[in-house]
Structure formats: C-alpha cells, structure tokens
From Swiss-Prot:
This is Nucleoside diphosphate kinase 1. One of its GO terms (biological process) is UTP biosynthetic process. The gene is NDPK1. HAMAP family: NDP_kinase. Autophosphorylated. CDD domains: NDPk_I (cd04413). PROSITE patterns: NDPK, NDPK_LIKE. InterPro entries: NDK-like_dom, NDK-like_dom_sf, Nucleoside_diP_kinase, Nucleoside_diP_kinase_AS. The lineage of its organism: Eukaryota, Viridiplantae, Streptophyta, Embryophyta, Tracheophyta. Belongs to the NDK family. It catalyses: a 2'-deoxyribonucleoside 5'-diphosphate + ATP = a 2'-deoxyribonucleoside 5'-triphosphate + ADP; a ribonucleoside 5'-diphosphate + ATP = a ribonucleoside 5'-triphosphate + ADP. One of its GO terms (molecular function) is nucleoside diphosphate kinase activity. Keywords: ATP-binding, Kinase, Magnesium, Metal-binding, Nucleotide metabolism, Nucleotide-binding, Phosphoprotein, Transferase. The active site is at residue 115. ATP binds at residues 9, 57, 85, 91, 102, 112.
Length: 149
C-alpha cells in the first residue's frame, strides 16, 4: 500500500476543519497511520518547504505555517497520493472544484487549508521528516470491504 503525508494548515485548525478533513479521507477508504498536533518551529518549516526556498513567497509561507498549530498525518491506501491530491483540490482555491477540500473551504491561495504530498517521493521524504518515530502498524477491519485481494 502507498502512503502520503497530509497537513492541515493553521487556518484549517483554527477554523475547526480537522474532523471534516479526516472524515473525507476515511470515507474514501484510506487508513490513518499517524497523526499529531504540532506547533512548528521556523527551522523545521524551512526544512519542510526547502524546495520552495528560492520562491518570492517562501518567507510568507514559513511565517504562515508557524503562526499556529498544524495537524500532521500519514494516510495509507491504494493510489493515496494521487487520489489525496484530488480530494484536496487545486493549490489555488479559486480554481478548485466544488466538492474538494479547498473548493469547499478556502478562498485565498495563501490560506488554502491543507497540504498534501505531490508524489510518492515527496511523500516518503515528508513522512520521514515529520514522523521519524515511525507509523502505527495496523489495518482496519474494513479492509476487505474496501479493497479487492
């Protein structure tokens, strides 16, 4: 099974969207493998977004991520990276489809509620960064009702 890193950003936490977001991933049939509420340190945020460090919006993004707690999660399931991105919606909420998290809950690109890994490689990197202690080893009893053999 594939894994992805999902982070509910400070605006999503402050607006009380944690349960709604978790529910959407659970209803799709994905399994929560790790979760923590974190106040992110500046140096850690800079490491997480290191690939964007040359962009003009980098400092604003870092300031935003450290402005309040985030919920860091790992989800597991078939094609969870690609499907997770579809559940999340386009980076710019104004072009996100209704029914996606950003399409339903966000307006500004700088307050777009959620982050999701964009590839298996970035998922592996982000999971290792955010969860060096490892993930929960379990499988839902619903597994055979969601996935074929």
């Amino acid at each position: 099974m594939e894994s992805t890193f999902i982070m509910i950003k400070p605006d999503g936490v402050q607006r009380g969207l944690i349960g709604e977001i978790i529910s959407r991933f659970e209803k799709k049939g994905f399994y929560l493998k790790a979760l923590k509420l974190v106040n992110v340190e500046r140096s850690f945020a800079e490491k997480h977004y290191a690939d964007l460090s040359s962009k003009p919006f980098f400092q604003g993004l870092v300031d935003y991520i450290i402005s309040g707690p985030v919920v860091a999660m790992v989800w597991e399931g078939k094609s969870v990276v690609t499907t997770g991105r579809k559940i999340i919606g386009a980076t710019n909420p104004l072009v996100s489809e209704p029914g996606t998290i950003r399409g339903d809950f966000a307006v500004d690109i700088g307050r777009n509620v959620i982050h999701g890994s964009d590839s298996i490689e970035s998922a592996n990197k982000e999971i290792a960064l955010w969860f060096p202690e490892g993930l929960a080893d379990w499988q839902s009893s619903q597994h055979p009702w969601i996935y074929e053999k």
